[in-house]
């Protein structure tokens, strides 16, 4: 538990540093951004075994935490916040990097959906985090990035899952 809190705090620290104008030059390097995306963001967006156990044991609690935002101190929420910060400050650079990882995640899912469903879950988190530009607790997301075709992503990736006859098999 302490380790997870440390990861969450480290991700929050990176978000704060990325927002500061005097440190932005560090994050403008494409190699650094790619390393942060690959080695920090993606692993912490993954739906982990502990997440699955909480969902299986108490789905209402899992959903409540997610909707209410009481998962604020989790590594997954901190990774989402880091994605939002990076995409708001380095949108064009980050779009290409995350686009490649999104393609990798969705390809992995398509290879074996029953086994690789976590890849699609991570992809969805990545897209929603990247697309978010502003919002409120009451209304949710109120502004989105123009670079992210959310209706198209939803039509191609979300709706088919919801329309699947056995949609509770995975995802």
Regions found by a protein language model. Give the residues of each.
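Short, intrinsically disordered, charge-balanced linker/junction segments flanking boundaries
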Residues: 1, 162-171
């Amino acid at each position: 538990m302490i380790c997870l809190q440390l990861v969450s705090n480290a991700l929050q620290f990176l978000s704060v540093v990325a927002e500061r104008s005097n440190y932005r030059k560090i994050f403008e390097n494409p190699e650094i951004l790619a390393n942060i995306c690959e080695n920090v963001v993606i692993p912490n967006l993954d739906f982990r075994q502990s997440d699955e156990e909480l969902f299986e044991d108490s789905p209402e609690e899992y959903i409540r935490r997610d909707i209410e935002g009481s998962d604020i101190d989790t590594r997954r929420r901190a990774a989402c916040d880091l994605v939002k910060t990076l995409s708001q400050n380095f949108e064009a650079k980050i779009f290409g990097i995350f686009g490649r990882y999104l393609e990798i995640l969705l390809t992995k899912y398509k290879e074996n959906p029953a086994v690789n469903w976590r890849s699609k879950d991570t992809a969805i988190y990545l897209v929603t985090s990247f697309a978010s530009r502003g919002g409120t607790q009451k209304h949710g997301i109120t502004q989105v990035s123009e670079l992210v075709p959310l209706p198209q992503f939803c039509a191609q990736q979300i709706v088919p899952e919801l329309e699947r006859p056995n949609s509770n098999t995975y995802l």
